[in-house]
């Protein structure tokens, strides 16, 4: 799964809501997966909304797709989720 941060540590929008046109993920089964940033955010946002941005109820070491994670315990305002690569690969993409 890919970690998608949507609120930065200072509480502002993060890279998935930024100005880049594309996001590249380093992969093992092929070198790079390149997707449109806006399409990625639209997909992730929809999945987060379907869950009402709910946090994971699993232990911290078990990744739950599209659950909201944060580091508020450490005084940080960031929020992120884990997006399965299978979902990301359904977006229009380039494998390099």
Language model segments and positions:
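Nucleic-acid endonuclease domains
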Residues: 1-96
């Amino acid at each position: 799964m890919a970690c998608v941060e949507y609120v930065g540590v200072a509480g502002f929008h993060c890279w998935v809501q930024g100005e880049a046109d594309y996001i590249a993920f380093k992969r093992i089964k092929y070198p790079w997966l390149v997707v449109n940033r806006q399409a990625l955010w639209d997909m992730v946002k929809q999945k987060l909304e379907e869950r009402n941005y709910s946090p994971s109820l699993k232990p911290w070491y078990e990744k739950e797709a599209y659950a909201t994670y944060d580091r508020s315990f450490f005084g940080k305002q960031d929020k992120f989720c884990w997006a399965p690569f299978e979902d990301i690969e359904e977006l229009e993409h380039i494998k390099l």
